Curated annotation (Swiss-Prot):
It holds the Pfam family CxxCxxCC. The lineage of its organism: Bacteria, Pseudomonadati, Pseudomonadota, Alphaproteobacteria, Hyphomicrobiales. This is UPF0260 protein Avi_1324. Belongs to the UPF0260 family. InterPro entries: Puta_zinc/iron-chelating_dom, UCP006173. It comes from Allorhizobium ampelinum (strain ATCC BAA-846 / DSM 112012 / S4). Coiled coil: none annotated.
């Protein structure tokens, strides 16, 4: 008898810290700078990454201290998942919150942290660090691929 994986049986608010952190697939999309239109409230992604994002691994270079270094870094909690519309449709937190399963490329399913990159879901190779871009120039880096990577992966047959 095989038991179901924890993400299929627990709500986000029932997970312990280790389970919660493992839901992050390491795509790095959360770590892209976003711009919000003050009039419409629309949030758009840029390809400008947080200075702490490792462009190869798509993981934070200083995760334990990230909020001290980057004060506006969002520490995602179960209560926030529903309210953050910019979480990509491929996000493990979003999927579990919506009662959906994780995709084959998620490290919890594949057992390999590289599959998120192999599937083309991550930010690897698509970003520039904010250390090299003036805030005034962020608009030059607007992009929509963070919200469409899942569709692109599905269209290429990588479901």
């Amino acid at each position: 008898m095989t038991s179901e994986p924890y993400w299929k049986t627990k709500r986000l608010d029932e997970m312990n810290t280790v389970e919660w952190e493992a839901l992050c697939d390491g795509c790095g999309l959360c770590c892209l700078n976003k711009l919000e239109d003050w009039e419409s409230g629309e949030v758009v992604f840029t390809s400008v990454a947080c200075r702490l994002l490792d462009g190869e691994s798509c993981r934070c270079k200083d995760y334990p201290n990230r909020q001290a270094t980057v004060p506006d870094c969002i520490q995602l909690t179960p209560d926030q998942v529903e309210d953050i519309a910019w979480l990509p449709p491929s996000c493990g937190y979003r999927l579990v919150h919506e009662g959906r399963d994780l995709y084959w490329w998620h490290p919890l399913v594949s057992g390999d942290p590289e599959t998120v990159h192999q599937a083309g879901i991550s930010a690897r190779g698509r970003t520039v660090s904010e250390e090299h871009v003036s805030v005034e120039d962020f608009e030059d880096y607007l992009c929509d691929w963070p919200m469409t990577v899942l569709l692109q992966a599905e269209e290429s047959g990588d479901q």
